[in-house]
């Protein structure tokens, strides 16, 4: 990393190709390999697979560029998906290395910006803010004062070349951009209509880091316009997303006088002191205290912004305007809503007393039962009606492993949905998983569920599935000592960085 810093901190005016030469450095692929093993960013360990060869990677890049100019495409272009050979080596293996190495190289400038942003800040607090549950206290604090939300599904680019064009604003390196364009061109050829879908799925799975980086960067470009408008507002001063506003150009070359004239009108329309934006993956929420007319203007602006500056067919039906008082918000697996909580206040004036009825807004979160049943049904724990089923694919495991898997799934779900006060959905999920576990064990031992539980003892499964309540107590020692009262509390954890999917526990 220090070598990257010394290279990238040179005078930018002297760097004609400040990224492209790094692709030919051997430690880049060592970092890419270590990152694939450790699931982390920029490890110092330089050991990597002996099957990888820097010389082959260099020759393959040169050969790819030569083929690009000769218009003789061979990269990932087979019908039977047999590995192509280049100098006796597997081109699919080394092309994947180039993809991973390219991602590491392009991420370096952004990583250095992140390090400079973190200087002097509490990193532990910033890491805790990355938890999915950290969003809900923010919603609970802000949304009770708002009226309308825009429920937005972020569209995907029409063509992969748009991703490369968006990257031009950050990466001033023609050679690297040409190489990226060639990768995307070969992918689009290989992923044509006549190519079976399973091949493209395999390709995208093997290069998830590459396309995930491009997609995340593309989404950040969407979001930067909201930050820009927020910073320009006279009512607000944003402290977030500072690194996304340091571009030389703003999306597109526009004549200055026209841009200034139009932009003042935009600021006049959208000058809103209570405008909040939240996103997770491909779904985002834009909330405001304004009227429905203001939200219609926001919807019109977002659609036109996507179509004009990103060349995306932004279907208006992907953006829904909902009133918080009348609609629930389906976000991050919770059904969130604003409900009125009535209260009575007795007022005394001299000899007369009377009651005043008052209603306050309260942010409420529920666990939706239908998506949970669908997820369990997809994972073969129950049928579509929620009736528990055995899991025969786990029949070859030991009894302790089977019980541990079922218990871990329930504890993960209970841990994630601890923010809901009404636990009736979790009680039903617990019933489905316990009975599915019992049926799996009974089928393995060729017995009935009743006789197996009688021999095993119901208390064993009950104790294993209620282990998560002890975790709650240890995590929050100031809470009530009774597990029942503790289980009814709303708890938001700061260690959840992804949604646990029961279908992935195969």
Swiss-Prot record:
Coiled-coil residue windows: none
Name of encoding gene: matK
GO cellular component: chloroplast
Top-level taxon of origin: Eukaryota
Major location (coarse): plastid
Lineage, opening ranks: Eukaryota, Viridiplantae, Streptophyta, Embryophyta, Tracheophyta
Record keywords, A-Z: Chloroplast, mRNA processing, Plastid, RNA-binding, tRNA processing
Location(s), subcellular: Plastid, Chloroplast
PANTHER family: MATURASE K
InterPro entries according to UniProt: Domain_X, Maturase_MatK, Maturase_MatK_N
Protein name (Swiss-Prot/TrEMBL): Maturase K
Reported function: Usually encoded in the trnK tRNA gene intron. Probably assists in splicing its own and other chloroplast group II introns.
Gene Ontology MF annotations: RNA binding
UniProt record similarity statement: Belongs to the intron maturase 2 family. MatK subfamily.
A Gene Ontology BP annotation from the UniProt entry: mRNA processing
């Amino acid at each position: 990393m220090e070598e990257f810093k010394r290279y990238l901190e040179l005078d930018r005016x002297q760097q004609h190709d400040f990224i492209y030469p790094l692709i030919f450095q051997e430690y880049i692929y060592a970092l890419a390999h270590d990152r694939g093993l450790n699931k982390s960013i920029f490890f110092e360990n330089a050991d990597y697979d002996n099957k990888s060869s820097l010389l082959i990677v260099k020759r393959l890049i040169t050969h790819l560029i030569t083929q690009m100019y000769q218009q003789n495409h061979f990269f990932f272009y087979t019908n039977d998906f047999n590995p192509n050979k280049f100098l006796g080596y597997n081109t699919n293996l080394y092309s994947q290395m180039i993809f991973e190495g390219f991602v590491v190289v392009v991420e370096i400038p952004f990583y250095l910006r992140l390090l400079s942003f973190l200087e002097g800040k509490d990193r532990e607090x910033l890491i805790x803010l990355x938890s999915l549950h950290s969003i809900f206290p923010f919603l609970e604090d802000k949304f009770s004062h708002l009226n309308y939300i825009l429920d937005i599904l972020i569209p995907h680019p029409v063509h992969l070349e748009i991703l490369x064009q968006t990257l031009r604003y950050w990466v001033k390196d023609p050679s690297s951009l040409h190489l990226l364009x060639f990768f995307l061109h070969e992918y689009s050829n290989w992923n044509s209509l006549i190519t079976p879908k399973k091949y493209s799925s395999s390709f995208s799975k093997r290069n998830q880091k590459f396309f995930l980086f491009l997609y995340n960067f593309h989404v950040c470009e969407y979001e930067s316009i909201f930050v820009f408008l927020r910073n320009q507002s006279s009512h607000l001063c944003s402290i977030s997303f500072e690194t996304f506003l340091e571009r030389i150009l703003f999306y597109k070359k526009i004549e200055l006088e026209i841009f200034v004239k139009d932009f003042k009108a935009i600021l006049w329309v959208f000058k809103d002191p209570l405008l909040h934006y939240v996103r997770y993956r491909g779904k985002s929420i834009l909330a405001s205290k304004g009227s429905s007319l203001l939200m219609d203007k926001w919807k019109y602006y977002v659609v036109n912004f996507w179509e004009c500056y990103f060349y995306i067919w932004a279907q208006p039906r992907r953006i829904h305007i909902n009133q918080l008082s009348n609609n629930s918000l389906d976000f991050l697996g919770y059904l969130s809503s604003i409900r009125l909580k009535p209260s009575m206040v007795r007022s005394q004036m001299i000899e007369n007393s009377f009651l005043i009825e008052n209603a306050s807004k309260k942010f409420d979160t529920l666990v939706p039962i239908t998506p949970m049943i669908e997820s369990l049904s997809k994972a073969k724990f129950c049928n579509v009606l929620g009736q528990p089923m055995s899991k025969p694919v786990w029949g070859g495991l030991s009894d302790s492993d089977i019980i541990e898997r079922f218990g871990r799934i329930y504890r993960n779900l209970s841990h994630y949905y601890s923010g809901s006060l009404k636990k009736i959905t979790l009680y039903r999920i617990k019933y489905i998983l316990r009975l599915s576990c019992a049926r799996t064990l009974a089928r393995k031992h060729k017995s009935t569920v009743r006789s197996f539980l009688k021999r095993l003892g119901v208390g064993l499964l009950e104790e294993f599935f209620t282990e998560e309540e002890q975790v709650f107590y240890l995590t929050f020692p100031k809470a009530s000592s009774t597990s029942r009262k503790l289980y009814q509390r709303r708890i938001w954890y700061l260690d959840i960085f992804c949604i646990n999917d029961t279908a992935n526990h195969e």
